[in-house]
C-alpha cells in the first residue's frame, strides 16, 4: 500500500465528520504549501501530519492533528508568531495551536496570516516540485479514533 492509501486508511478510522474536516484541512495546507514534505505519525492519541521543507521532523513548520472529536492546527514555533488577535492557544515554550471548529476557520484571514508568517520565518520550502508524503511512525497501541459513547 502506498503512503497516500495508508494515510486515507488512517483517516477513515475517524467519525465521518472528523475525517471530512481532516481531509479539508490537509487539502487546504497542501494547496498553500505544494512543495512541503508531509510527515505522517499515527500516534497513540492522534493522527498527525506535519508540513516542512524536508523529511526531518525538527524542521516541520505546521501540523494537522486529528483527534476523536476535532481537528487542530499546530504551529511548531508558534511562540515566535505575532498574534495580535489572540487566536493561538497554548502555554508551552514553543508550540501553539488552534482548534479548527468549524473547519472553515482554517480559511479565515487570521489563520491564513499566521500560516504565512510561520512559513516565512521557517527554514525555506523547496521552490519547485511536489512535496513527498512519508509515513514516519505508526504506534502499536492507539486510543480509539472515535468519540467515547
Where are these regions (language model features)?
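Charge-dense, helix-prone N-terminal extensions
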Residues: 1-149
Amino acid at each position: 500500500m502506498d503512503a497516500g492509501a495508508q494515510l486515507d486508511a488512517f483517516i477513515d478510522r475517524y467519525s465521518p465528520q472528523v475525517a471530512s474536516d481532516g481531509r479539508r484541512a490537509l487539502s487546504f495546507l497542501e494547496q498553500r504549501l505544494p512543495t512541503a514534505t508531509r510527515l505522517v505519525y499515527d500516534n497513540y492519541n492522534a493522527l498527525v501530519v506535519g508540513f516542512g521543507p524536508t523529511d526531518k521532523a525538527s524542521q516541520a513548520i505546521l501540523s494537522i492533528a486529528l483527534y476523536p472529536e476535532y481537528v487542530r492546527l499546530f504551529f511548531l514555533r508558534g511562540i515566535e508568531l505575532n498574534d495580535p488577535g489572540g487566536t493561538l492557544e497554548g502555554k508551552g515554550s514553543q508550540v501553539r495551536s488552534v482548534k479548527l471548529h468549524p473547519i472553515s476557520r482554517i480559511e479565515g484571514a487570521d489563520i491564513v496570516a499566521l500560516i504565512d508568517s510561520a512559513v516565512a520565518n521557517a527554514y525555506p520550502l523547496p521552490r519547485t516540485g511536489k512535496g513527498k508524503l512519508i509515513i514516519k511512525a505508526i504506534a502499536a497501541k492507539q486510543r480509539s479514533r472515535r468519540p467515547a459513547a
